[in-house]
Swiss-Prot record:
Pfam families: DNA_mis_repair, HATPase_c_3, MutL_C. GO terms for cellular component: mismatch repair complex. InterPro entries: DNA_mismatch_repair_CS, DNA_mismatch_repair_MutL, DNA_mismatch_S5_2-like, HATPase_C_sf, MutL/Mlh/PMS, MutL/Mlh/Pms-like, MutL_C, MutL_C_dimsub. It comes from Bordetella parapertussis (strain 12822 / ATCC BAA-587 / NCTC 13253). This is DNA mismatch repair protein MutL.
């Protein structure tokens, strides 16, 4: 056995190098810390110069307030800061930095020089991170921080750095995140003295366009809402513009870029019904909340936060984004007054227009699925009786009679008998305007699968099964939302072993569990008894269901498992209950489906995230036939 080593205080340099291991991971980490200091100093113009991807040099110049010469040595001292003075200030901190560790940590693993000049000073002052000697220097008002030879003093850390190109890419990412949070600040980036990026002061929308490009902005929906002390604004992509990678997801809490699982879970919930496969939404969201309601002192790099009431934040974000996505269909699907050539370069030219900022006004009472028997979708058209047999469930959910479910399926009006293959001449009616009928008027059915329609912009092609599937699905969801959630009492409670933290969750979230349809009680210090569950899920694995709900509650403070399970069931029902391919529809039936799509939320995608319709403008069609060329 080796001899015991006595306890000793570590040298300051080693302490700073250990701290640097938590904060300084690569050149991009250095750049982030320096940029945040510049923002806190009130800078309105920041210039960044890199060499070797930031490995050899990172120089950041700002026009902020500067540092007085007598405070320069303190700037390189650990835990010295101008941002906070007490615990109360820490708990409500609004600045980007507050720990007082960044510059000291950087100086311990690289050569660092600071040149700073306060406003009104005759000249600038300079300090070297090694000698800590302060000397006169020349320079404009503001601060320049020059970092060279990163990790030369810690060779083991330098071995983990990637190529110059890779590290430069990370530096660009770090700068983009800061630039998106502060559009009022001008940024310039040089690499080996070559200009790489330049962003002028702008509003949030223009800065997002400047940083992420028109390809991103042309396919987004604006988000803006507030409730009490919490507000959310920004942009989220339309479902049809979702990406294969989660690489364009920017969340800012009180101006600070963070990665938060509560908000991420809320966004996934909002997109649950409209994303296809494993596609990922892109977004730039700014969440403003009372600084006292969020803890930013979770990680030295300040990439994580902790909300005091994570459940409330989750519900707010999920509801706001969900309502934004819901309003993309219907009357806003094809904007009026858009030039023919203005269709975006998206996967589908018929993507919906951006909804107006803010929460949409409540819609009118939800209409019946289709016009009642004997009623035509267009006034003046002959009424036809319907003969479609209602869809029947093979096995209805426990606790809900089959007749209740079947009543949710309203048949298409009109005779279901196959129509003549020849296109009948439709009555001469004026072409509806975009305001009246955005999806236009049906012309014909193609291969028993698609509906061809004409609107004020051009040609609309609708996948009738996918469209009807979404309509029926939304009707089913709304019908269930309007009724009390049935609960199934268990004859014999299901008791299972659980960790102490899960037992505590049951006690803490008793009210929320009851609202979800669960009755759970601790049956001992390490066991839980389930006495009742939602009737929809009564035939499932009760223990696995309970554990999954508790896992969600422990992770993000809320559980959407019941909603997800319910929606999965309703999606299957809607798929089987919607009009099938190769069914011949009359023009009245086609128009009835188009009208129903226009008033149905999320009608642009089916339940599986696939598009339900696409738009070709007259200009698009002219190009196909080389007209006007």
């Amino acid at each position: 056995m080796s001899d015991r080593r006595p306890i000793a205080t570590l040298p300051d340099l080693l302490i700073s190098q250990i701290a640097a291991g938590e904060v300084i991971e690569r050149p991009a980490s250095v750049l982030k810390e320096i940029l945040e200091n510049a923002i806190d100093a009130g800078a309105r113009a920041i210039e960044v110069r890199l060499e070797g991807g930031g490995i050899r040099r990172i120089a950041v110049t700002d026009d902020g307030s500067g540092i007085p010469p007598e405070e320069l040595p303190l700037a390189l001292t650990r835990h010295a800061t101008s941002k906070i003075r007490s615990l109360d200030e820490l708990e409500s901190v609004a600045s980007m930095g507050f720990r007082g560790e960044a510059l000291a940590s950087i100086a311990s693993v690289a050569d660092l020089t600071i040149i700073s000049r306060t406003r009104g000073a005759e000249h600038a002052w300079q300090i070297d991170g090694g000698s800590l000697q302060v000397s006169p220097a020349s320079g404009p008002p503001g601060t320049t921080i020059d970092v060279r030879q990163l990790f030369d003093r810690v060779p083991a850390r330098r071995k983990f750095l990637r190529s110059e190109a890779t590290e430069f890419g990370h530096c660009v990412d770090a700068m983009e995140r800061i630039a998106l949070a502060h559009p009022e600040v001008a940024f310039r980036l040089f690499h080996h003295d070559r200009a790489q990026r330049q962003w002028l002061p702008a509003d949030h929308g223009q800065r997002i366009r400047d940083v992420l490009g028109a390809e991103f902005v042309d396919h987004v929906l604006p988000v803006q809402a507030a409730a009490g002390a919490i507000a959310l604004m920004g942009m989220v992509t339309r479902p049809t513009a979702a990406r294969a990678r989660a690489d364009r997801q920017y969340l800012y809490v009180n101006g600070r870029f963070v990665r938060d699982r509560t908000v991420s879970h809320a966004l996934r919930s909002a997109y649950a019904d409209v994303l296809h496969g494993d596609r990922q939404p892109a977004y730039v969201l700014y969440l403003d909340i009372d600084p006292g309601a969020v803890d930013v002192n979770v990680h030295p790099a300040k990439h994580e936060v902790r909300f005091r009431d994570s459940g409330a934040v989750h519900r707010f974000v999920s509801q706001v984004v969900g309502q934004t996505l819901a309003q993309t269909g219907g009357a806003e699907a094809v904007p009026a007054g858009v030039p023919d050539g203005a269709a975006p370069d998206a996967a589908y030219a018929g993507e919906p227009a951006a909804a107006a900022p803010g929460l949409a006004e409540p819609r009118a009472p939800y209409p019946a699925a289709y016009p009642s028997p004997g009623q035509s979708p267009y006034q003046g058209s002959p009424a036809r009786p319907h003969t479609q047999v209602p869809f029947r469930l093979h096995g209805e959910p426990a606790g809900i009679p089959a007749t209740d479910w079947q009543s949710l399926y309203r048949p298409l009006p009109g005779d279901a008998a196959p129509a003549a293959t020849a296109l009948r001449a439709a009555p001469a009616t004026p072409l509806p305007t975009a305001d009246e009928h955005p999806l236009g008027q049906a012309l014909a059915q193609l291969h028993g699968i698609y509906i061809l329609a004409q609107n004020s912009r051009g040609l609309v092609l609708v996948d009738m099964h996918a469209a009807h599937e979404r309509v029926v699905y939304e009707q089913l969801k709304r019908a269930l939302d309007d009724r009390a959630l049935p609960r199934q009492d268990l004859l014999v409670p299901v008791v299972f072993h659980a960790a102490e933290k899960d037992v505590a969750l049951v006690e803490e979230h008793e009210t929320q569990l009851n609202e979800l349809g669960f009755e759970m009680r601790p049956s001992g210090p390490a066991s839980i008894a389930v006495r009742s569950v939602p009737a929809l899920l009564a035939r499932g694995d009760i223990e696995s269901l309970a554990r999954a709900v508790l896992r969600d509650l422990g992770a993000v403070g809320v559980s959407r498992l019941l909603t997800e399970q319910r929606n999965e069931l309703l999606s299957t029902m809607a798929c089987h209950g919607s009009v099938r391919a190769n069914r011949r529809l009359t023009l009245e039936e086609m128009n009835a489906l188009l009208r129903q799509m226009e008033i149905t939320e999320r009608a642009d995608q089916c339940n599986h995230g696939r598009p339900t319709w696409v738009q070709w403008s007259v200009n698009d069609l002219d190009k196909l036939f080389l007209r006007g060329q």
